[in-house]
Amino acid sequence: MSSVPKRAKLDGAPADGNTSAAAGNNEEESEALEQIDACQNEIDALNEKASEEILKVEQKYNKLRKPCYEKRSELVKRIPNFWVTSFINHPQVSGILDEEEEECLHALNKLEVEEFEDIKSGYRINFHFDENPYFENKVLTKEFHLNSAAASENGDWPASTSTPIKWKEGKNLLKLLLTKPYGNKKKRNSEYKTFFDWFSDNTDPVNDEIAELIKDDLWPNPLQYYLVPDIEVEPEDEEDNEDNDEEAFDDEDGEDGEGEEEEEDEDDK
């Protein structure tokens, strides 16, 4: 039972006539608190049961969705650059894509998210690649083990693991991008500098925003991002610079004109 909240003591003892009434009130309050506590226990039990049933329903529909995802994956292969386009058009995921990584991701022919049997325990993200000039791997996988039921091979949880990337000679993007200036045109709204930096990092599996975006947003419906219309981006600040130059030129002319007028006035005098 929940502990009874403390109440401020009243100054002075109650009059003899009120003693029995106060005792009756305390007894009634204690009984009510016991009943409230019993109700709360019942609610908690129902919530727990609901979670278990929701989990079973989710597992059932994960199996039902699987053939649809597989069919979609086969159809996607007929569309060149489907996944890299979806990545580029995603407002958050695009924030960690370097230009050379975009070139690399043109070889991405399939994205796949697999939830573990107990969906609360974790999931894996599989990136399938065609032959490409950057690495030897055909599949790169990042796994998330979020509770003891899905502890990683060394028994740790929460934990995440990533496939070691077999970079081709001179093509290690993690090393190449370390030497590039960080001032890219794209705004970086993430703690990760680049896509492969995110893929290789396993320090905080519980709060991996990019993984959650891929699993819960990009994977269920990539078409909404692939079909985002192209937006023409005007060269940054060119017009503003021209306007500023014109204003500066006008200001100089104005100052020169004022100087000439003052000289003419002095000559007239």
From Swiss-Prot:
One of its GO terms (molecular function) is chromatin binding. Pfam families: NAP. Residues 231-269 have a biased composition (Acidic residues). Residues 1-33, 227-269 are annotated as: Disordered. Keywords: Phosphoprotein. GO terms for cellular component: chromatin; nucleus. InterPro entries: NAP-like_sf (IPR037231), NAP_family (IPR002164). It comes from the Eukaryota. The modification Phosphoserine is found at residues 30, 148, 152. SUPFAM superfamilies: NAP-like. Belongs to the nucleosome assembly protein (NAP) family. Interacts specifically with B-type cyclins. This is Protein SET. The gene is Set.
